[in-house]
Design a protein with these regions (language model features):
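An active-site-proximal "capping" alpha-helix that borders the catalytic cofactor pocket
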Residues: 114, 428-429, 502-508
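FAD cofactor-binding and catalytic pocket of flavoenzymes
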Residues: 68, 83, 87, 93, ...
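Residue-level detector of alpha-helix initiation sites
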Residues: 7, 11-12, 262, 415, ...
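Glycine-rich loop(s) and the adjacent beta-strand/alpha-helix scaffold that form part
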Residues: 23, 34-39, 43-44, 195, ...
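N-terminal Rossmann-like FAD-binding beta1-loop-alpha1 element of flavoenzymes
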Residues: 5-30
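Redox-cofactor-proximal catalytic regions of oxidoreductases
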Residues: 49-132
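A glycine-rich dinucleotide-binding beta-alpha-beta segment and adjacent secondary-structure elements
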Residues: 61, 186-189, 227, 382, ...
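Conserved redox-cofactor binding core of oxidoreductases
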Residues: 109-219, 449-452
Length: 508
């Protein structure tokens, strides 16, 4: 069978493309390397590593993918529904700095262009403001007052059925959509919602798309793409099979790649430099890769329970360029605590910060031991998600090697991405004093000066020319017909807030 379009990836961009194409009557196949989930399939805690983490090489087929490079650490989602399965439901419209970024402002007034599509995305994702102030939110509000930024403190907008009851109903689509239950506020959003309250993509865009004829092929990885005889040829292999990689080839007239910024760049760089099967892709593929100018730090060991409500419930801006949210895991989901150590101030070299951490651990042994033996870390800890609109970027490159090659992130340019954001550190320390908790930094940031992000963006610059961009202003790939990219890789700048709503609106 020859499809009208094949979509690779079922995250926000891929789900939008799939629904809007089948609505127009096209025959569409969606290829997703991850698994399909029902609410009861999700793990009860993130200690259930085979169900939580995506590491196919050791037969872990969860939905949380952790990618470690020498210059950056990246968290992303895998499965039918992509990042929506693991994200913290937070749906924000960015500040004006993003829309005015020089990387794309010459193509139009993006705030005005995207306004109706933000409305459409908000409707589909069920965007609604969380209204409660829990203990941890009130502490963040106190910090905002201390930093003369109380006017920026607010509750967040989320895509969760926060007003529902235990009885199943369709709160979003007037009875046309799937049934849901109400949120029980367990903070389990990032471990997979077992309550069927989270408005994930398989419950909105993909649900309707399948009703209209979309074919979804899960547990299948797109490995090679070629274009000849006016058709795209997609060579795939099974990801989860016990009996080797079952290979299949699919053909289509058009192609949408939306495998997430990381997945899209790996797939396309491989086609250009490993297989030479898409040789006309732009030479700037992989450039302008961004982390959303993001860092993560934490406070743990507080005397009170700090993981109430949803995974993210409140936010404030300590300065005009910075957006800080508190992030929580549910009870008994302590696996992520091992990524954190005692906090160390200063944007020094990794050697200097590592030495400071060693000295602090030796001179404050009780503090160190409290973090190690804190078996209720997810209950008494909050993580600070610090995001900025500051314009910095890295570059993703493909390195051919004896074993097939690999991706590498180059963070040496003029717009080097920092691993340490001083204003975020200050928020963390002020918060720690108020809850008598212990400030913590991510160890990889301290030891290797390596930024960590849950929101990798960019890598496919926008331009009128193939020499300076991968896509045009309509997200069409230069050099090939009916080939589009609709995920985070086409976001042209650091958003400074959670990017899911923007990726959805841009795809719309």
């Amino acid at each position: 069978m020859i499809y009208d379009y094949i979509v690779i990836g079922s995250g926000f961009g891929g789900s939008v493309a799939s629904l809007r194409l089948v609505e127009k009557g096209y025959k569409v196949l969606l290829i997703e390397q991850g698994k399909r989930y029902k609410p009861e399939d999700f793990p009860k805690s993130n200690w259930n590593i085979p169900k939580y983490l995506w590491v196919p090489s050791i037969r872990c087929f969860g939905f949380q993918k952790l990618s470690f490079y020498s210059t950056a650490s990246i968290m992303s989602g895998t499965g039918v529904g992509g990042g929506s399965l693991v994200y913290a439901n937070t749906l924000y419209i960015p500040p004006d700095e993003f829309f005015n970024n020089q990387s794309w402002n010459r193509f139009g007034d993006w705030k005005k262009i995207l306004e109706p599509y933000y409305d459409r995305a908000s409707f589909m994702l069920g965007r609604k403001k969380y209204s409660k102030l829990n203990i941890e939110d009130k502490v963040l509000e106190d910090v905002s007052k201390d930093m003369d930024a109380h006017n920026t403190f607010d509750s967040v907008f989320v895509g969760v059925n926060i007003d529902g009851s235990e009885d199943e109903s369709d709160p979003y689509f007037g009875g046309l959509g799937p049934l849901r239950k109400g949120c029980i506020e367990c903070a389990g959003c990032m471990v997979g919602c077992r309550e069927n309250a989270k408005n994930t993509l398989d419950r909105n865009y993909l649900w309707f798309a399948e009703k209209m004829g979309l074919e979804i092929l899960p547990e299948t990885k797109a490995e090679k793409i070629s274009y000849h005889n006016n058709l795209y040829h997609i060579e795939t292999e099974s990801v989860t099979s016990f009996f080797g990689n079952r290979k299949r080839i699919f053909e289509s007239k058009g192609l949408i790649v939306a495998a997430g910024a990381l997945g899209t760049l790996e797939l396309l760089l491989k086609q250009k430099y490993k297989y030479s099967s898409l040789p006309f892709l732009s030479p700037v593929l992989g450039h302008e890769l961004r982390t959303n100018a993001e860092t993560l730090c934490a406070v743990s060991g507080g005397a009170e329970k700090l993981n109430n409500g949803l995974a993210i419930t409140s936010v404030f801006s300590p300065d005009p360029f910075t957006h800080v949210e508190i992030v929580k895991y549910p009870d008994k989901s302590n696996a992520m605590k091992w990524f954190f150590g005692l906090s160390v101030r200063g944007a020094d070299s990794s050697i200097s910060r590592s030495w400071k951490l060693f000295v602090k651990s030796i001179t404050h042994p009780l503090l160190f031991l409290k973090t190690v033996f804190n078996f209720n870390w997810s209950t008494n800890a909050v993580i600070f998600l610090v995001m900025q609109t500051t314009d910095n970027a890295m570059k993703m490159v493909w390195i051919n090697g004896l074993f097939g090659g690999k991706m590498k992130i180059d963070n040496r340019g003029n717009k080097k991405v920092p691993a340490y954001i001083a204003i975020g550190q200050e928020v963390m320390e002020r918060y720690a004093r108020k809850v008598t908790g212990i400030p913590q930094n991510i160890l990889l940031e301290v030891f290797f000066n390596r930024p960590t992000t849950a929101h990798i963006l960019g890598g496919c610059p926008m331009s009128d020319s193939i020499d300076t961009g991968v896509v045009d202003k309509n997200l069409k790939v230069h050099g090939y017909p009916d080939f589009y990219i609709t995920d985070g890789s086409v976001i042209q700048g650091n958003i400074g807030v959670n990017p899911s709503l923007t990726i959805t609106a841009v795809a719309e």
